[in-house]
C-alpha cells in the first residue's frame, strides 16, 4: 500500500511540475523549430520566427501533451493544471502589447488556433477577436476611432465562438446555419446584397440577434468574461482534434490520434481595419506542382477566414502569380 501511495504521489508531482505552456514574443521564445512534436508545427515555427527576428505577434503555445491530458483527465482538471501558467503568459502578452485582457479602455484581443505536428489544413478550429463583449467593443471603437471595424470584429467573434465553442456550426450541408440565416435576413431588411454594405447600426443588430440565437439554441447567455471565453476556446480546439473531419483526415494521411494538437494563443493583428490592412496566405513552393516559387494571395480589409470562404476573390501576392492567374482565367473563358 505504501509503495502504491508513493507511486501516486510521484505521478501527481510529475503531472503538476510538467511544463505545458511555452511563450514567445519580442525576439525571444521558449521553444524552437525542432520541437514540433511538442509544440505542433505552428507553435514550433512561431517560436523559431521570433528567434530569427521575424516580427511575430507575441503569444504562447500549449503543448500537444495537454491534448492527451484533456481526454485522459477531463476539462476541469486540465484547466486547473494550466490556469497559473496561462494567466502568466497572458500577462506577458499584455506587457508586450501595452494593453489589458478584458479591459474596457485598452483591450487586448487574442486569437486561438490549433497546430498539430503534421499539417491538417481546415480540419480543426480557430477563434479570432477573443476578449470582446458589449463594453469592450465600445472601448475598442473609441481606441481605434473605427466603430465599423470594432463591431465587425465583434460580429465575427460571436459567430465563430458560437460555431466552434458552443456547437452551433451546422453538421450537414442541409442544416440551417443560424448565424448566416440572420445575416441574410438583416441584409434583406436593409436592401443590400453584400455583407460589407451593412452599416455600423446593422452590425450592432447582428450581434444582438446572434446572442439571442445563442440563448435559444444553447440555453446559455453568450459569455462576457474574457477568461471564460479563453478557456472555452482552448478546450474547443482540443475537442476539434476528435471531430469527424479531423478523424477522417488522419485516417487518410496516416496520422496517429495520440499525437494530439497544440493550441497557440496570440495577440490579434487586424486585417479588417480598413484599406491599409489585409489578410493573406503564402507558400515557399507552388502547391500544385512543387515548383520552388514563392506565391500566395491576399484580401484587403478582411480577416483570415475571408481568404478561404470564397465570398471575395483574393489578389495574388506576386506579379508572376497574377500573370499565371490571368492565363488560367483566359483558358477557362476559351473552354
Regions found by a protein language model. Give the residues of each.
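Short, Lys/Arg-enriched N-terminal segments with co-localized hydrophobic residues
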Residues: 1-15
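Nucleotide/phosphate-binding sheet-loop regions of phosphoryl- and nucleotidyl-transfer enzymes
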Residues: 14-332
Amino acid at each position: 500500500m505504501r509503495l502504491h501511495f508513493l507511486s501516486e504521489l510521484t505521478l501527481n508531482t510529475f503531472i503538476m511540475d510538467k511544463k505545458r505552456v511555452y511563450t514567445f514574443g519580442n525576439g525571444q521564445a521558449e521553444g524552437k523549430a525542432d520541437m514540433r512534436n511538442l509544440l505542433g508545427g505552428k507553435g514550433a515555427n512561431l517560436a523559431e520566427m521570433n528567434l530569427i527576428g521575424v516580427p511575430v505577434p507575441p503569444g504562447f503555445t500549449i503543448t500537444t501533451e495537454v491534448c492527451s491530458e484533456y481526454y485522459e483527465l477531463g476539462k476541469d482538471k486540465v484547466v486547473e493544471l494550466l490556469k497559473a501558467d496561462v494567466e502568466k503568459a497572458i500577462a506577458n502578452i499584455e506587457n508586450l502589447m501595452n494593453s489589458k485582457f478584458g479591459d474596457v479602455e485598452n483591450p487586448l484581443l487574442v486569437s486561438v488556433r490549433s497546430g498539430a505536428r503534421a499539417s491538417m489544413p481546415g480540419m480543426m478550429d480557430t477563434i479570432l477577436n477573443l476578449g470582446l463583449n458589449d463594453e469592450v467593443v465600445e472601448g475598442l471603437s473609441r481606441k481605434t476611432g473605427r466603430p465599423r471595424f470594432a463591431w465587425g470584429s465583434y460580429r465575427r467573434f460571436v459567430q465563430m465562438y458560437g460555431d466552434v465553442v458552443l456547437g452551433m456550426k451546422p453538421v450537414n450541408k442541409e442544416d440551417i446555419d443560424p448565424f448566416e440565416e440572420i445575416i441574410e435576413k438583416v441584409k434583406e431588411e436593409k436592401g443590400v446584397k453584400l455583407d460589407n454594405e451593412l452599416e455600423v447600426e446593422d452590425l450592432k443588430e447582428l450581434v444582438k440577434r446572434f446572442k439571442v440565437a445563442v440563448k435559444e439554441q444553447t440555453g446559455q447567455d453568450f459569455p462576457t468574461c474574457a477568461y471564460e471565453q479563453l478557456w472555452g476556446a482552448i478546450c474547443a480546439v482540443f475537442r476539434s482534434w476528435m471531430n469527424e473531419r479531423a478523424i477522417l483526415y488522419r485516417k487518410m494521411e496516416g496520422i496517429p490520434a495520440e499525437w494530439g494538437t497544440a493550441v497557440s494563443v496570440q495577440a490579434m493583428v487586424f486585417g479588417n481595419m480598413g484599406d491599409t490592412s489585409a489578410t493573406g496566405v503564402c507558400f515557399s513552393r507552388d502547391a500544385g506542382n512543387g515548383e520552388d516559387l514563392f506565391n500566395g494571395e491576399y484580401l484587403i480589409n478582411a480577416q483570415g477566414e475571408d481568404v478561404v470562404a470564397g465570398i471575395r476573390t483574393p489578389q495574388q501576392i506576386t506579379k508572376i502569380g497574377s500573370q499565371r492567374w490571368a492565363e488560367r482565367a483566359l483558358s477557362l473563358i476559351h473552354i
